[in-house]
Amino acid sequence: MKKAILSVSNKSGIVEFAKSLIKLDYELYSTGGTKGALEDASVPVKSVSELTQFPEIMDGRVKTLHPAVHGGILADRDKPEHLEQLSEQHIDLIDMVVVNLYPFQKTVAKPDVTEAEAIENIDIGGPTMLRAAAKNFKHVTTIVHPADYNEVIERIKEDRLDEDFRKELMIKVFAHTNEYDHAIVSFFKGDSEQLRYGENPQQSARFVRTSNSKHTIAGAKQLHGKALSFNNIKDADSALSLVKKFKESAAVAVKHMNPCGVGIGDNIETAFKHAYDADNQSIFGGIIALNRTVTSDLAETLHAIFLEVVIAPRFTDEALDILTKKKNIRLLEIDMTIDNREEEFVSVSGGYLVQDKDNFEVAKEDMKVVTDKAPTDDQWDAMLLGWKVIPSVKSNAVILSNTKQTVGIGAGQMNRVGSAKIALERAIEINDNVALVSDGFFPMDDTVELAAQHGIKAIIQPGGSIKDQDSIDMANKYGIAMVTTGMRHFKH
């Protein structure tokens, strides 16, 4: 029977993963809160102390730092002498290590964090197990991100948990521990930047970096321009998160944490044109994120517009020559890698909230056509584009999109039909291939009726209202194709 050690601070998906391992004939060992969570879910699990024959001590500071753990992880199965030594010491082989670390970055991001709190959230046993297992990836599977749980289970079932895949996991581990160590260094070194002011001039502010990853705003390489402001940083992060979702060439324009124009195309110049045309007024003074290299042709276009920030994976030398003639524009070079394990937090009085970033997607085949009329291919393309954009728009959010761009955005209204009115009234075009996209279900049929009055023929929304049928009936009445996704995308 294979053995796995599970010790995680982020317990998202761990119970389901553990149950799957049990079905695949794994014996599970765990510690502290992870063990408690598994036991509460009636998952058979043993304490790591049963491996070590040594209790957890010092308030849990020492629990996995033991030869019975690390010998079982580090043993080279291809060396008979390693196996003989394990046998002599009565140490069992460990086949899988599932660990994510104490939330140091989240802890030190609190404005009132003390040094003592930070120290208690420096993980020792976790990184040690991760590094040991990653070093021995030839024989041991190491998982640091919950996003990898499903693929690992599928590969075990299909006998595809091979060395190449374990090497991919190893790389993720060392990237993760490197980032973790950098966060510790940054905190104690005082790696924060005083900003000119906060959201408004009367508010003081600073930028505390807890990561140096090239795919983050904190790790971005600024090529030109004065220091980023508080609002620049927030808007740039919002634009970056959205543009990363697109595999095709894409451009995103953001103002006040909301996209004002999103476009895609066969090349980045066309994508930007579509984003610009989506709302050529609101883009003034905005933040632009692009997922392809900025060329000289695109730079000429950007140079003619007042923009605060331009984000891209790369700028050609010719593009830099053009754009750096503008003194105040800020140019950021950022890796466009998507990190599905990212979390976000919001401070509230007396504490803070933590959640996974809303990077979740619904496959087209898992969406459901609920009306008599099915969407055309162009309507599907319009819906899917809009569905990528909608999580980035403040709720209540209703947007209109075609196959290449957003054409109307209604954000942040207290009722859904109000957002729909804004999107419809501001639309640059409405035709049979424009889809209406809603981040939440329709509590009544009024939004569908309003859409019909404006000529909308395709709608995508989460569904789930007790009055869903009223909206479906209204769509059928006007010959509208409606799709439900089963997943909402509120943003507050």
From Swiss-Prot:
- Name the catalysed reactions: (6R)-10-formyltetrahydrofolate + 5-amino-1-(5-phospho-beta-D-ribosyl)imidazole-4-carboxamide = 5-formamido-1-(5-phospho-D-ribosyl)imidazole-4-carboxamide + (6S)-5,6,7,8-tetrahydrofolate; IMP + H2O = 5-formamido-1-(5-phospho-D-ribosyl)imidazole-4-carboxamide
Record keywords: Hydrolase, Multifunctional enzyme, Purine biosynthesis, Transferase
* Comment, domains: The IMP cyclohydrolase activity resides in the N-terminal region.
Please provide, in alphabetical order, the Gene Ontology terms of the cellular component aspect for this entry: cytosol
Q: Which NCBIfam families does this chain map to?
A: PRK00881.1, purH
Q: Which family does it belong to?
A: Belongs to the PurH family.
Q: Which PROSITE patterns match?
A: MGS
Could you say which EC number(s) this protein's record lists? 2.1.2.3, 3.5.4.10
Name of the molecule in the record: Bifunctional purine biosynthesis protein PurH
The MGS-like domain sits at 1-144
Q: Which pathway does UniProt place it in?
A: Purine metabolism; IMP biosynthesis via de novo pathway; 5-formamido-1-(5-phospho-D-ribosyl)imidazole-4-carboxamide from 5-amino-1-(5-phospho-D-ribosyl)imidazole-4-carboxamide (10-formyl THF route): step 1/1; Purine metabolism; IMP biosynthesis via de novo pathway; IMP from 5-formamido-1-(5-phospho-D-ribosyl)imidazole-4-carboxamide: step 1/1
Q: Which GO terms describe its molecular function?
A: IMP cyclohydrolase activity; phosphoribosylaminoimidazolecarboxamide formyltransferase activity
A single GO BP term for this record reads: 'de novo' IMP biosynthetic process
The reply on keyword Transferase is yes
Q: Which gene encodes it?
A: purH
InterPro entries reported in the protein's UniProt record:
AICAR_Tfase_dup_dom_sf, Cytidine_deaminase-like, MGS-like_dom, MGS-like_dom_sf, PurH-like
Classification via PANTHER family: BIFUNCTIONAL PURINE BIOSYNTHESIS PROTEIN ATIC, BIFUNCTIONAL PURINE BIOSYNTHESIS PROTEIN PURH
- Gene3D superfamilies to which the protein is assigned, alphabetical: 3.40.140.20, Methylglyoxal synthase-like domain (3.40.50.1380)
Please give one Pfam family short name: AICARFT_IMPCHas
CDD domains assigned to the protein according to its UniProt record, in alphabetical order: IMPCH
